[in-house]
């Protein structure tokens, strides 16, 4: 199957893009090639599809639930008790709704962490998106739960082969306060053995940092360093509370970080995410929406806006985090973080693209 997009606007220039076997083969002006399908790109902007690098798709079912609460009471009193009641069918339909929402706002790939992996995978398979799905690990420092998580993920790494190549598996230890050091070290070895990523919430709140020092004797990043699990396979969500030395640790070990501005604001976890400092140190910084209960939507355009405005506000610097940098975080950096050659409109990259209609009419009567 080949596709030719004719006359679209790419970085302000009229451009043609030729696609073959889901890959961009040529980018230029007035391409003279034959294609199975020709798309009229006139008056449309051509952009890479967004990569939502951290979310919990089926939490569309919890949108607006548990509002106005800090993280731990929100998790312990609202989210975890109700997640325990979800059926496989609930997760399936919640994920399908999430996929629809992401498609409508330009997301083509997402990185998910949630229960009932197979229900999520079935929904994604049917909706046509690309996804990296993390098999969740909790043990709450109980050996019997650690063994259960190990056995489940040993099955998932095999089961994912039953799906198309659009769907990949990662291992997802929830956080250092719900997963023991022993299980984290097992996960590190398991991920290396199977060449899969690891996804973990880390350094999300000041309370997490205080408790980490009290429980383990180290801040969260230093604790992972002590355990020996900082590596290029590790992708951490949030990473708000890190100092300069820890940023260097992350960079030196190739750890990727996903910024989630909406949920950080809603849960008042923190707003001083060190986007500029991490990028300068060489850390790949991607962007995510988090789940709908803690951010209320899966709109990566809103996530870009919030990330940029927050960064400018707390730094008191209107030049911080320009549009080009935050757009790169939402596209190419997200793809790089999860191991995809996507997020750029260039030869050899996956043709995960969006056309934005520049002539949409807005009915002013509907917004008065």
Model region roles, listed by residue range:
Residues 350-368:
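C-terminal cap of metal-dependent C-N hydrolases
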